[in-house]
Design a protein with these regions (language model features):
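Amphipathic, positively biased hydrophobic alpha-helical segments used for protein targeting
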Residues: 17, 41, 84-86
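Conserved beta-strand termini and adjacent loop/short-helix elements that scaffold enzyme active sites
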Residues: 42-44, 88-91
Length: 91
């Protein structure tokens, strides 16, 4: 199993509005992917910071997710927003 955890770090209220607008579709598409066990993104007490937690069944599933995201509206339109993620492999 692959887990990703960390934060999405917006710099402006405009970035936060963009994340809020695009996030529902991004969550729905990700949760429908083969191998997605869990996908949670939530705004923290700081409105510019979002907590992210993902679990995928295998590295192959996780890598397929990463490829889809890069080409998606979410990936293209939020590429400028800083990510602070840790990826770990669990038995």
């Amino acid at each position: 199993m692959i887990e990703l955890s960390g934060r999405l770090l917006c710099e402006t209220a405009g970035d936060t509005a963009l994340v809020s607008a695009l996030l529902p579709e991004h969550i729905a598409l990700t949760r429908a992917e083969p191998g997605c066990l869990r996908f949670d993104v939530q705004q923290t007490a700081d409105p510019l910071v979002w907590s992210v937690f993902e679990q995928f069944r295998s590295r192959t599933d996780f890598e397929a997710h990463q490829m889809r995201v890069k080409a998606s509206s979410w990936g293209l339109r939020t590429a400028h927003i800083k990510r602070d993620y840790t990826v770990t492999e669990k038995a």
